Amino acid sequence: MKKHGVLNSEIASVLASLGHTDTIVIADCGLPIPAGVKRIDLAVEIGKPSFLDVLQVVADDMAIEKVTLAEEVINNNAEVNKEIELKLIEPAFEYVCHEQFKEHTKKAKAIIRTGEATPYANVILHAGVIF
């Protein structure tokens, strides 16, 4: 049994398979998941698990080069936006409109659906390299 890091076997497998610039999405419970993209559904009830809890665990186990967020999060969910900026200090940040964000999710290797039920609590993580 693993002692630390991501214990969820599906998430651990996706993280291990990522190459440089590949993307994964951590999403609230309302983000549409495009056909053909792997869905890892962690939601058990509204708010559980939280977006920020899942983001922290994944970020601790992943080399992240860039982060993409919907620009609407700035005005509609400032608290989550601030927490993302505090948790992910090193990667570059990119903000796009929500419609563009949803288009970008079509290229993701996987979308991790949380129980989060606050607006625009979604992030695209772009894989970096460890060297």
Swiss-Prot record:
Substrate binds at D28, H98, Y120, A121, N122. The active site is at H20. GO terms for cellular component: cytosol. Transmembrane segments: none annotated. It is found in: Cytoplasm. It holds the Pfam family RbsD_FucU. It catalyses: beta-D-ribopyranose = beta-D-ribofuranose. GO terms for molecular function: D-ribose pyranase activity; intramolecular lyase activity; monosaccharide binding. Pathway: Carbohydrate metabolism; D-ribose degradation; D-ribose 5-phosphate from beta-D-ribopyranose: step 1/2. Keywords: Carbohydrate metabolism, Cytoplasm, Isomerase. GO terms for biological process: D-ribose catabolic process. Its EC number is 5.4.99.62. Homodecamer. Belongs to the RbsD / FucU family. RbsD subfamily. Catalyzes the interconversion of beta-pyran and beta-furan forms of D-ribose. This is D-ribose pyranase. It comes from Bacillus cereus (strain 03BB102).
